[in-house]
Amino acid sequence: MFQKAHINTVSVGIFSWAVLEPEEGKYNLGWLEEIIDNLYKEGISTILATPSGARPKWMADKYPEVLRMDPDRTRRFFGGRHNHCYTSPVYRQKVHDMDKLLSQRLGSHPGVILWHISNEFGGECYCPLCQQKFREWLKEKYGTIEKLNSSWCTTFWSHIYNSFDQIEAPSPKGENELHALKLDWNRFVTDRTIDFIKGEVAAIREGGSELPVTANLMYDYNGLDYKKFRDVLDVVSWDNYPSWHKKEEFFTAIDAGMQHDLMRSIKNQPFLLMESCPSATNWKPINKLKKPGMMLVSLFSSGSRLRQRFILSAASEPGGF
């Protein structure tokens, strides 16, 4: 089927942690290796993903600190995808161990050509661990609390801080009007995310693989400063689901072209399209079947070197990739 569809590269393992490690410390990589072997025999290359985008239930139950805390300081339940704390030492260690093992077992496979780090990084955590890292980040940036107060204009509304320990991240239950606080928090979230990516890449290198790495960025996402990703990614990739065949097509064309240009400009080099859909998706009210070749023309004329579809297999399949 893949050959008939002219598919020469696939991404695997993206949301597969619960299958790769069904119980703590008990790993099952055989099925993944078999898939990569079979693809390679058919002349199809593999982009191997790290599974940190969705953690298994046993981890959330045993180590609740891996779950995010919302702005109102309540801990989330298990579920969803981006529901993990980028600061949690437990989560970072678990991710490190998994990534290193994948690198050791599969990083030198001749069919593997690229590492896909996690999936669609985004969101933020307001737990005590992240709060403390935020205070350390502020202290490193400003040096003294006096300089922070001056830069943030905290005299307004009598919001002067006496020490960095008094500072809390923005919250609907507390400080949520101080623009400088919100801006620095967003900058901190980007730096925290990048630091997490660096940890994943380091684990892969420890496992022996020197293959390039990418991370699939998201359309028009303003929660992270993508320009800062240029130093941690070898190649930029992103996910694009344009809604073609509306009344005014040129808006969609212009928007898609602009997004392609933004992704290409992050590293000033060709990019990859990691996700797209030729027909309908289950999260858009309207997403018509595209005319043959139209996305291909838009994509490659803007500098892409890869077009991948998501998702080709049912989520009930092993690994859910």
What is the meaning of each model-derived region?
Residues 2, 10, 39, 102, ...:
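Conserved, mostly hydrophobic/aromatic
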Residues 6-8, 40-46, 108-113, 208-212, ...:
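Short, well-ordered coil/turn segments that N-cap beta-strands
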Residues 2-76, 100-103, 107, 197-208, ...:
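Aromatic-lined substrate-binding rim segments of carbohydrate-active enzymes
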Residues 72, 76-235, 239-256:
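Polysaccharide-binding and catalytic clefts of secreted carbohydrate-active enzymes
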Residues 58-61, 125-130, 319-321:
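Short aromatic-enriched loop/helix-cap "lid" or pocket-rim segments at secondary-structure transitions
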Residues 25-31, 89-97, 254, 286-291:
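Glycine-rich anion/phosphate-binding loops
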Residues 77, 214-321:
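Hydrophobic targeting/anchoring helices
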